[in-house]
Amino acid sequence: MEGNPYLDRLYEMKVFGKWDPTEVEVRDPGLKDYICLKPMYLPHTGGRHAKKRFAKAEVPIVERLINRVMRTEKNTGKKHLAYNIVKRAFDIIHERTGENPIQVLVQALENAAPREETTTIIYGGISYHEAVDSSPQRRLDIALRLITEGAQQRAFRNPKPIEECLAEEIIAAARYDTECHSIRRKEEIERIAEAAR
């Protein structure tokens, strides 16, 4: 019996036509259910998840990165520009590491996701900070935000293009380099939470 040609094509789908998300491994058990590695030709779901609670866990992780890049200052609302930035950044990551850029991105997210943070509690008119564990969804949101903030800061008043800065930030976070913005901020968040116990 021959296989279904539609299903065969479906399983051959690669992000940007190059990178296979099915061979990516998520090592962090807390983030495993929230990092979506669904294969798709074009990482663009059109905001179908916007009104459903926890539905962003079903949005492919590459699209979530594109959406975060799109939300920064002069890139606001320009999805095609953000798409091209991430596409070129993935090419740079592959050139420098020789690995699947989606795997490098997943490692960077696992390393940049803070495990605990603080919340403000007001008791008897006095406010103080209390350490709390971060939910997996929030950990992923913070990691994406820190990585894109780091890339934006590297590119500001710098002749390097944003895609190169994004690639450098992702590679540095994947290697747990404490000089990069995302890892430095993550450690700062966890240090403040430890002091507030």
From Swiss-Prot:
Example GO molecular function term?
Answer: rRNA binding
Keyword rRNA-binding listed: yes
Pfam families hit by this protein: Ribosomal_S7
In its keyword annotation, does this UniProt entry include Ligase?
A: no
Give the HAMAP family listed for this entry.
Ribosomal_uS7_A
Q: Subunit details for this protein?
A: Part of the 30S ribosomal subunit.
**Which protein, by its recorded name, is this?**
Small ribosomal subunit protein uS7
Organism (species): Methanopyrus kandleri (strain AV19 / DSM 6324 / JCM 9639 / NBRC 100938)
Gene it is expressed from:
rps7
